[in-house]
């Protein structure tokens, strides 16, 4: 079974590009990362930074998660991210997405040993 840390990497890490390469980026990425397998995932964020930099956030600013848990951490620096949001015309299995580029602080939930990101909570 896929570990929570591996799932985070599959769903949220794209270190190979510095930003969304094209308007089709989200459609391709959401499909290739299996985020549209049994439904269209409405919103998903990809982080364009080295994995080590994202893992390091787990030792940065401790903040409360949206669900009230206390194991969330906010990055000290801004990171290059792409938000993929489902379009109005999107209908499973033909999921369609719009990409929004941003440089924001990310907030991730961390757990385990080693202490690594397992959930993308927000960007601010």
From Swiss-Prot:
Question: What sort of enzyme, by top EC class, is this?
Answer: lyase
Tell me, how does this one assemble? Monomer. Interacts with and forms tight 1:1 complexes with RNH1. Dimerization of two such complexes may occur. Interaction with RNH1 inhibits this protein.
The family note in this entry says: Belongs to the pancreatic ribonuclease family.
Please state what the protein is called: Ribonuclease pancreatic
Output the PANTHER family linked to this UniProt entry: RIBONUCLEASE (PTHR11437), RIBONUCLEASE PANCREATIC (PTHR11437:SF24)
| Location of the protein in the cell | Secreted
Give the source's domain of life in one word.
Answer: Eukaryota
Molecular function per GO: lyase activity; nucleic acid binding; ribonuclease A activity
Q: Which UniProt keywords apply?
A: Disulfide bond, Endonuclease, Hydrolase, Lyase, Nuclease, Secreted
- Can you supply one Gene Ontology CC term for this chain's record? extracellular region
The residues the record assigns to binding substrate are 7, 10, 41-45, 66, 85
**What single Pfam family name could you report for this chain, choosing any that match?**
RnaseA
From which residue to which does any coiled coil extend? none
Which residues does the entry assign to the active site, renumbered to this chain?
A: 12, 119
Give the protein's function. Endonuclease that catalyzes the cleavage of RNA on the 3' side of pyrimidine nucleotides. Acts on single-stranded and double-stranded RNA.
Known tissue expression: Pancreas.
Biased-composition ranges for Basic and acidic residues?
1-13
The UniProt annotation puts the region (Disordered) at 1-24
Q: So what EC number does this one have?
A: 4.6.1.18
């Amino acid at each position: 079974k896929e570990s929570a840390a591996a799932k985070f990497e599959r769903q949220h890490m794209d270190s190979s590009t510095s930003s969304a390469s094209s308007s089709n980026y989200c459609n391709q990425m959401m499909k290739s990362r299996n985020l549209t397998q049994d439904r269209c995932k409405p919103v998903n964020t990809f982080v364009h930074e080295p994995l080590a930099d994202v893992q390091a956030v787990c030792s940065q600013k401790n903040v409360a998660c949206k669900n009230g848990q206390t194991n969330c951490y906010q990055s000290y620096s801004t990171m290059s991210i792409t938000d993929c949001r489902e379009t109005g015309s999107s209908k499973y299995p033909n999921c369609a997405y719009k990409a929004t580029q941003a440089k924001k602080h990310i907030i991730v939930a961390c757990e385990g040993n080693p202490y690594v990101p397992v959930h993308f909570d927000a960007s601010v």
